Amino acid sequence: YPKGTMLKVYERDTGKYLGEIEQARQTYSVVGNMNEYQVTIGETTFGGRPELADSTGIIDYGSLLYIGLQRSRTAREAIKIMTDLVQQYGYYSEGESFTIADPNEIWIMEMIGKGPGIRGAVWVAVRVPDDCISAHANQSRIHQFDMNDKENCMYSPDVVSFAREKGYFNGVNKDFSFSLAYAPLDFGARRFCEARVWSYFNKFTDNGKDYLPYIEGKTNTPMPLFVKPKHKLSVQDVKDMMRDHYEGTPLDISNDFGAGPYKTPYRLSPLNFKVDGQEYFNERPISTQQSGFVFVAQMRAHKPDLIGGVLWFGVDDANMAVFTPVYCCAT
């Protein structure tokens, strides 16, 4: 693009026009959530403290994701581009968790704004070890992180000091938890969000029983950001997990009172409801009928980018979807 070209930014969820930013001189092809260099970015919204939203920002989470894909060749480069963008133009959305990956690395980055009229965001990004798996499901997952490990951890310079300034944290740096400071846990975050992460960890590790009390509200000790699985996961393993309804666990919704004679794993919204003044809730599984689409990203360093990146894409509920492979350089 010629120098000085501007890019109009529209909010992903509503189509609302947010403003203009300077376009990069060169951008890369993007198919779904993967670009031509196999860089892949996914997200879940955790919301966090409502007073930190900034409606004057230009960059919303969806634009941040796709502009990051258009401009990056590695996961680390995507993190720098995304954080530079919100620092320059302001962050419009609520708290967000991003999975940012390339053929060699996977990072979890969490970000939240600083409040009305305050440009920028506080954020932290942690690299997932090669022998581990991680997950996030609409609740902030990063607690303590090693501020001295520059190779595996990146963060905004004020991520701790801003929390102190706002009164969210008053301990020593090593005890700082991004999640507790910026997205305090409530019942919904634990049972409807963290429970989905628990199901994933329960499926592929032997630690599920140790983490279940946290999901049930019996302890406040959180699950780790990442864990070592019992075996290396395949593409099929991840597809199957996206179809999960807590089958075979204490949270299996095909066995509760709402399952009916056919043991259906589906429930109508809302998750909470009242009968005769008594409040009840349905479990919120990974697979749900409210889904618009689902994907599994396969990134392969041992193959050329042209055929190395495959986006296994399906529409609607993952349990009903057919995963169709699309190469990252498809036109």
Locations of the language-model features?
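Intrinsically disordered or highly flexible coil/loop and linker segments, enriched in small
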Residues: 91-95, 251, 304
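Substrate-recognition/cap regions that form aromatic- and gly/pro-loop-enriched pockets
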Residues: 262-331
